[in-house]
Amino acid sequence: MIVAQVFFEDINNEKNKEAFKNYLRGKDLMFVGVGTTKAYLDSCGPKICSKLKRDNLTVFGTEEDQFHGANIERKINVLNDVYKNKFKIAIDSCVSEAKEINSIILDNEGLKPGAGMNKIFPRVGDFSLKIVMSDSADEIIKYTTTSSCEVNELKKVFDRVDRAVQKTYTFIMMCLRELENEMKLKKWS
């Protein structure tokens, strides 16, 4: 079920941050990046998890060790066995309506990878952050092979993905820092 939708220009909205933090409080967290850098519009999950890994957070599915449709059935068992006690937050790019592009959909039911491409894979995570990158699965496929694309067109796509990664990463880190500060205040009171 969708808990909140956060548009990039509104990541500081207290109501949206609180909706996310409510699911994080008191949990042993990890982040799961779903997607591939071979399809640039589908690369948000591994790119964000690579950034979170540099902040020493527990992650699965980075740019260096991707978690995507070609390996999900093999790797999901590792994820669920090794990290069975973690609260898994799945992060993936997704396809939705045009009016939802440049937003993050917070969902408390985990993630159904490949749904936008009509593929059926096992559900991933306990909670998900779905980054709306396009309103068309065809656009995702178009940027899988870049040989037919103009350089200027590719640059725009790269900029879109970079912005989505930065905004989502910022939203996650703001919420985690606020939770950390709440814990410190409780400890001192």
Q: What are these language model-derived features?
A:
Residues 1-189:
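N-terminal catalytic or cofactor-binding beta/alpha core of small enzyme domains
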